[in-house]
Each structure stands twice: as structure tokens, then as C-alpha cells.
């Protein structure tokens, strides 16, 4: 058993040291990219579980790709924060390129964020998940769930990691809205998403419609 575990560690380390596919680094360095979603970090290296701990790089943060390996990408934000994100858990379900293409995107998520209701916008900015959120809003807030436990985002149940020991689940209803958040702790305040209030009609002027003499 120890030998099998050791082999697994050796394979993982070897994958980290392998270069990215030819041309992939140059492709990402030539593009204007930003983070798809909120990314949490405690150190300068995190993984695709995106634990809900530490500081946050907000969704839509512009980044410059510095380096890539067979299962990691290193980037720097405009503010100078350098972070390496390792594709640790989902590498058997999706390729390095598929994963990076989800993590770093060309279309600014902030433009889409601005179309959400005010309560949904606040939840995303605070990295929360609340009942009534759409799949898109949950991804922007929490990131993509690791694919080794959530094979597809069309599933009605997603598994996330609060930290390296604790998981929680996000369940969706048939309309694609969050119905339940199961597990504790979890990044929720139990405040269901509310639609924005309808604007109050402007009263018509008393002189409106009168003919001029």
C-alpha cells in the first residue's frame, strides 16, 4: 500500500514538472484574459478545489499568464499578485487546456454580473451561495466544482470543498436554481436571492395633455 501511495506521489510530481503542450503558453500569453470567478488563496499556490479560505481574487480580474506546466498555470494580476493554480483533482476528467479555458476567460464576467439582481450581485461579490441563484451565478461566486466529484455542471448536485477536510453540496431544482446548500460550514447566509423591486412609475404632470392656447 505504501508503495502504491509513493508511486502516486511520484507521478503527481512528475506531472507538475512536465511542460505544457507546445504552443499553449504562447497562446494564453497573447490573449487578454481575466478570472472566470472568485479564486481563493492562502498561499501562492492553490488547487482546483478552490477552498473557501484566505483572500480572494475577484471574478473578472485581468491577469497575465506567466508560466504553465502539464497541470498548472501561473498568472499575475494587475495589482501584482502572483498565483499558481494546480489542476490536482480533475485532471482525469478534463485536459489541461479544457480546465485553463474555464479558469481564464476572454469575456469579462463583470459585464454579466451587472445584469443580475442586486442581491445576486452582492452574493457573488461576497463569494456566497444562496437559494435562488442560477448555475452561472454559483460558478462566478464559488468557481467550478472539481470534476472528480461533479462530472458535469448540468448535474443537479455539485460538491465543493470549504477547506481541505470539509465538503458541502449545492443542489439545484428543475428550473436550474439553487434549492439547498447541504453541509456545514458552507459559504451561505441563508438569504434567498430576491428580484429587484419594480421602478415606481413617474407621476404625470398636472398640465400633461392640456392644449396650449
Walk through the language-model features, giving the residues of each.
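C-terminal motif of bacterial Sec signal peptides marking the signal peptidase cleavage site
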Residues: 12-15
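Sec-dependent signal peptide recognition
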Residues: 2-8
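Residues within mature, well-folded domains
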Residues: 17-213
Amino acid at each position: 500500500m505504501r508503495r502504491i501511495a509513493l508511486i502516486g506521489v511520484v507521478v503527481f510530481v512528475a506531472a507538475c514538472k512536465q511542460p505544457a503542450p507546445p504552443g499553449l503558453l504562447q497562446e494564453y500569453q497573447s490573449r487578454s484574459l481575466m478570472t472566470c470567478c472568485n479564486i481563493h488563496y492562502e498561499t501562492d499556490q492553490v488547487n482546483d478545489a478552490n477552498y473557501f479560505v484566505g483572500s480572494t481574487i475577484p471574478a473578472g480580474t485581468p491577469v497575465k499568464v506567466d508560466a504553465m506546466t502539464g497541470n498548472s498555470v501561473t498568472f499575475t494580476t494587475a495589482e501584482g499578485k502572483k498565483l499558481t493554480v494546480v489542476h490536482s483533482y480533475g485532471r482525469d476528467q478534463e485536459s489541461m487546456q479544457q480546465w485553463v479555458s474555464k479558469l481564464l476567460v476572454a469575456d469579462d464576467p463583470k459585464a454579466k454580473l451587472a445584469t443580475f439582481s442586486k442581491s445576486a450581485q452582492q452574493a457573488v461579490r461576497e463569494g456566497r451561495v444562496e437559494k435562488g441563484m442560477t448555475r452561472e451565478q454559483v460558478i462566478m461566486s464559488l468557481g467550478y466544482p472539481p470534476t472528480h466529484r461533479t462530472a458535469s455542471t448540468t448535474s443537479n448536485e455539485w460538491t465543493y470543498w470549504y477547506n481541505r477536510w470539509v465538503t458541502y453540496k449545492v443542489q439545484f431544482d428543475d428550473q436550474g436554481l439553487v434549492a439547498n446548500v447541504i453541509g456545514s460550514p458552507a459559504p451561505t447566509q441563508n438569504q434567498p436571492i430576491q428580484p429587484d423591486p419594480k421602478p415606481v412609475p413617474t407621476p404625470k404632470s398636472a398640465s400633461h395633455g392640456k392644449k396650449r392656447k
